[in-house]
């Protein structure tokens, strides 16, 4: 995967990518703009597990894998099949898991079973959330009059159903100058046909395909975009350990919030706020790439502040002991719908305790929401660091956190000392942003600050 560490190869790569300014932008849909991939994966795992379980109960000859390993095998196969048209993905799944032999099911039947479970567009189905930063990016491109297209493996009918359940509904589709669906092409991704179609509908000649910037979340999509001659940004929907599968992309970002359009000759976002009292120094191990020279640390105020409330639970036991930075962890499970609105990364805001320590007041807080790559965590965590010294632990007390701004993506570090230094710098960004009055919109939450 590309690295942000400065060297001649990286400089040459950046120059090559920026050589031809991008004039048009093409988006994938699922996993890039709307968060359907996780929903589909859960359904696939459930359906396939049920099939294998029934087969196992009716036959003495079946996989010797434990249930846990079997589910991980299914989940891996579902992830690897992402980005394709439904039947193509089902064919890959059946082949990878040997389902015709192990469960007596063919690709078409598997697809029908999964579709019956999903039932996009039906009443009562939970809203499909937008990917963090999706609407911000689409609105900005529209405002700057940059032509955009949608190139999705989803069929026209399925697109209609999905957008009915989408958080923003049909509104999102109004931002596109052209829409291309999977049933309009003979071959699906990783074949480049759909990106050729999108380019043509945007009025871009084949020899100018390099002026199109594509946003994709899967290796199949990246392969298709590059085969079409486009420049491709990957915002991976796969787990971090699979990031090597995105080596073909021109850029890899952790989320749409981290995208720096100016690196591609497009207008620069204007909503980041510099904290001029905190110098910017690129972190060792930060995997983001940017050709932009920054002088100061910065933050991005959330379009909507987010409240997270729950009992303080015991975390991994490393905040105080290893880092000297005590965190008050919250349980992810009951807060899943809220944190799905946030990209994994570092945020700041405020926190208050609602139990015996309520009298300590409202405290500024820096928090990690994600997978903490330094410790290679496999499950998501919410780890607020309250910038206040407490006399005692407060496990099981109710903690309310108001998430106000995004600071940066998660990144890995080579040493614990580097990690600690970075966390303390995040705290400085939080303190300085509030001290300098750089965060507006807090008045709308004045009732929250009342204890």
Residue ranges and their predicted role:
Residues 1-23, 27, 55-69, 257, ...:
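Eukaryotic N-terminal low-complexity, Ser/Thr- and Lys/Arg-rich leader segments
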Residues 2-8, 12-22, 139, 155-288:
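Asp-based, Mg2+/Mn2+-dependent phosphohydrolase catalytic module
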Residues 18-144, 157-160:
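N-terminal helical cap/lid subdomain that shapes the substrate entry/recognition surface
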Residues 33, 130, 148, 187, ...:
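Conserved SAM-binding loop
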Residues 49, 230, 424-428:
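Solvent-exposed alpha-helix faces
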Residues 82, 103, 127, 152, ...:
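A structural signal for short, well-ordered beta-strand elements
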Residues 294-451:
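Phosphate/ribose-recognition catalytic cores of enzymes acting on nucleotide-derived substrates
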